[in-house]
Amino acid sequence: MKEVRLRTSSEGIPTLRRSLCCDGVIFDVMAGLGNQLFQYAAARATSLRLGCPLYLNIDWFDRYTDRELALNAFKIVGTLFRGTKWEKFRDRNYPRLAPRVEYLGNDIDQRIFAAQPGMRFMGNWQSEVYFRAFTQQIREEVSLSVPLSENSRRVIDQILSRSAVAVHVRRGDYIADPATSKIYATCAPDYYQRASAKLREMVSTDVTFFLFSDDIDWATQNLKFLGNCIPVDCNGRNRPWEDLALMAACNHNIIPNSTFSWWAAWLNPNPNKIVISPAVWYIQPNMSNRNIVPNNFITV
C-alpha cells in the first residue's frame, strides 16, 4: 500500500515530509469557514466514493493570516497536515507528491468524479452536487465537536422559544477589498426587504428575525423594516462556527451570496424550512454559478 509519511508538529498536526505518492486523496483547504466546509464535503465524498483515506492540506493558513482553520471545530474525518510547501516537491529531495487537479471555476468539474487515490485537488467545489450522494454522512460530520459558549447558549434558548428566522448580512471584504468587490455582488437592503416580505407570505405565524452580520451596526441601522428583530453579536471572527450553529438552529434562513450562511441554511434540520437566497451571486454574468443554489432554496 502506498504511504504518506507523517510526523507530528509542535501543534499536534502531522507534518508531511517525503512521499512519492499516497494511498488516499489529498485536498487543499483554504479561505473562510464556508469555503472550508465545501472543500471538506467534496473531499470526504470523494474518499468515501473511492474507499480510501483523506488527507487535508492546510498549508494555506501558514501563508494567509487573515483567515483561520475552523474545520477542527467539527467532527471531520481525515488527516490534517501541514509541512513543506508544494513547490518544494520540485526539489530532488522532495519528489512530487501527486498529480494535481486545480479548479476554481463555477461549473461542475467532472474530473473529481474520476478521481483516483494518489491525486491532489485544489478548488472551491461550491455545490452540493459534489457530495449529494453522501448527504446524511456529511451532515453528521459537519456538526460541532466543541461546546457552544455561554453567550451562544443563551441565544439558542431565545431561538428555540419562538418562530425564528436567521438573517445574514455579509459586508466585510465585499465592501472593503477592491478585488473582492469586483467579483461579488453586495446584497442591498432592498434584497432583504423583498426576501423578508416573501418569507412572511409563506409563514402563517409571527416570526422573530435574528440578525447576523460582520457589520452588525450597519445591518441594524439599515434593516429596521424587519421589525421584530434581535441582533446577534456575541462571537466575533474567532469563533465563526458558533454563528453558523445559531443560524442553523433557526426555523428559516435568509442568506446573502455567502458560502458561510449557505452552510447554515443547508445544515438547518427543519424539514419545513424556508431558505431565501439572492438570484445573483456574482457581478460578472460569466462567473455565474447556477449550481451553488440548491433546488429547495427560493431565489428573489
Model-derived features with residue positions:
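Active-site rim elements
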Residues: I26-A31, K182
